[in-house]
Amino acid sequence: MFYWLIDLSNTVPGLSIFKPMLNVFRYITFRTGGAMVTGALFVFLFGPWIIDNLRLRQGKGQPIRADGPQSHLVSKKGTPTMGGLMILSGLVVSTVLWANPLNPYVWIVLAVTLGFGFIGFYDDYLKVTKQTHAGFAGRTRLLLELLIALAACYALIRLGREPFSTALVIPFFKDVVVDLGWFFLAFGAFIIVGAGNAVNLTDGLDGLAIVPVMIAAASFGMIAYLAGNAVFADYLQINYIAGTGELAVLCGAVLGAGLGFLWFNAPPASIFMGDTGSLALGGMLGSIAVAVKHEIVLAVIGGLFVLEAVSVIVQVASFKLTGKRIFKMAPIHHHFEQLGWTEPQIVIRFWIISVMLALAGLSTLKLR
């Protein structure tokens, strides 16, 4: 919305005197900062009202796993879920205000985010109303996620330039590109769905998921800005993708809304993100990675999410094949709880790991 002030200053005679001042809205960096501040303020202001309403409507709050750590049955009982609504509301408001409304990449990523958010919301709704940890049928949920992801990947392919639109870029090497053809649809959908569910699995302790999400969003905001700038892309020898720089504004909005949410989600949490938030934010990260052609780098920057997802896969596979469990409990953050680590220890140490992985992922921009 604010982006249109530039055009108004050119077309409305009375606003021409403000043109030098309004010119700042041309800059993605300025609008990214504005989106970040707006997202944070929105969640700070409306967060208490949203939490009170969710607590009133949900009654007993999110059901706690009976087979999980016993401390959770006491410390987390009665805490409302669906806190992702706070983040998504801040994200949408900030994006509408600060992003270029004519940029198709913005709307594709936003569509994936809200689509996954709706799936997560329905999953949370079933869990709360039925007071069971089992929500949406797994296959149905996965099918809906795949449909959204496939539609987004198809739109991204149509936006890109051939044959690069279906290419997989290999980091660390200059100009090493593998054209996947239409198989890129399946690959891109796998990245988006995988990211959504990996973040979902990570969201098991107070503050554990939101900070790594913010770190990843900040990292991909930088990558999107650089990939969407012809000068920087040429200097760093990364592929230039016109228009993707605008995705930095979305990342700024997530960073701000995430900071606001963390205020209420810090231990002991007043609200949980729920599948509403974790699925949506993971899907957003996956779709941005596909849009800017840094899918492999997402596995590095989001390595913590990968670790959480792999721990579940390994645990399930091992138990089905051998009848034995590799970890005391999965996802892996619960394994460390069973080893005696306190919740703050696990959360802060995982944050540190996320920072280190983000730095490693960003370093690939220069290692060519």
Curated annotation (Swiss-Prot):
Compartments it resides in: Cell inner membrane
Record bears the keyword Cell cycle: yes
Domain of life: Bacteria
Catalysis performed (reactions): UDP-N-acetyl-alpha-D-muramoyl-L-alanyl-gamma-D-glutamyl-meso-2,6-diaminopimeloyl-D-alanyl-D-alanine + di-trans,octa-cis-undecaprenyl phosphate = di-trans,octa-cis-undecaprenyl diphospho-N-acetyl-alpha-D-muramoyl-L-alanyl-D-glutamyl-meso-2,6-diaminopimeloyl-D-alanyl-D-alanine + UMP
Pathway as given in its UniProt record: Cell wall biogenesis; peptidoglycan biosynthesis
Topology of this chain in the membrane: Multi-pass membrane protein
GO MF annotations in UniProt: metal ion binding; phospho-N-acetylmuramoyl-pentapeptide-transferase activity; UDP-N-acetylmuramoyl-L-alanyl-D-glutamyl-meso-2,6-diaminopimelyl-D-alanyl-D-alanine:undecaprenyl-phosphate transferase activity
Listed EC numbers: 2.7.8.13
CDD domains xref list: GT_MraY
Record keywords: Cell cycle, Cell division, Cell inner membrane, Cell membrane, Cell shape, Cell wall biogenesis/degradation, Magnesium, Membrane, Metal-binding, Peptidoglycan synthesis, Transferase, Transmembrane, Transmembrane helix
Protein's UniProt keywords contain Transmembrane: yes
Transmembrane parts of this sequence: 32-52, 79-99, 102-122, 140-160, 176-196, 207-227, 247-267, 271-291, 296-316, 345-365
Entry cofactors: Mg(2+)
An annotated GO cellular component: plasma membrane
Any one of the GO BP annotations: cell wall organization
Annotated family: Belongs to the glycosyltransferase 4 family. MraY subfamily.
Cited NCBIfam families: mraY
Protein function: Catalyzes the initial step of the lipid cycle reactions in the biosynthesis of the cell wall peptidoglycan: transfers peptidoglycan precursor phospho-MurNAc-pentapeptide from UDP-MurNAc-pentapeptide onto the lipid carrier undecaprenyl phosphate, yielding undecaprenyl-pyrophosphoryl-MurNAc-pentapeptide, known as lipid I.
PANTHER family attached to this UniProt entry: PHOSPHO-N-ACETYLMURAMOYL-PENTAPEPTIDE-TRANSFERASE, PHOSPHO-N-ACETYLMURAMOYL-PENTAPEPTIDE-TRANSFERASE HOMOLOG
The protein's name in its UniProt record: Phospho-N-acetylmuramoyl-pentapeptide-transferase
Protein's gene: mraY
